[in-house]
Amino acid sequence: MISADMEGATGVTWTGDVVPGTEQWQRMRRLFTGDVNACVQGLVAGGATSVLVNEAHSAQRNLLLEDLHTSARLLTGRHKPLSMMQGIDSSVDGVVFLGYHTAAGSSGVLAHTYLENSITGVW
């Protein structure tokens, strides 16, 4: 399983890169899809026969469906009870956290954290 966020994906350097509808976001969608495909390809090369990809950024409609690796099974769209981990169950052998941002208070790109009772550093 891959839980794929966009804020730590290849090329992302500022907020405008991940805001749906912007020119920068359109460019980053291609790079994000490439990151996911590279991960899927690596998992398949390592023996995976099917890879669930839970898209986990913003409205969760960022990956380019027509370019997604054929071994990927995509879970997309909002209102998932388990949010970024939707799809996890006893059949999942492992999880890759791909493209996640750094934690609030760190010096990384787009650093923020969602905690159980609070939200910190949302831009």
Locate the predicted segments by residue.
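N-terminal glycine-rich anion-binding loops that anchor highly charged ligand groups
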Residues: 1-18, 28, 32
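Short beta-strand segments
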Residues: 3-4, 54-55, 95-100
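Short, well-ordered, mixed-charge alpha-helical segments that flank or form enzyme active sites
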Residues: 10, 60-63, 102-108
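A solvent-exposed, charged loop/short amphipathic helix patch at secondary-structure junctions
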Residues: 14-27, 113-123
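Alpha/propeptide regions of enzymes that mature by internal proteolysis
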Residues: 23, 27-54, 60-63
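Short coil/turn connectors at secondary-structure junctions
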Residues: 46-49, 70, 90-94
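A glycine-rich helix N-cap at a beta->alpha junction
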Residues: 69-89
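Internal, conserved structured core segments that host functional sites
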Residues: 84-123
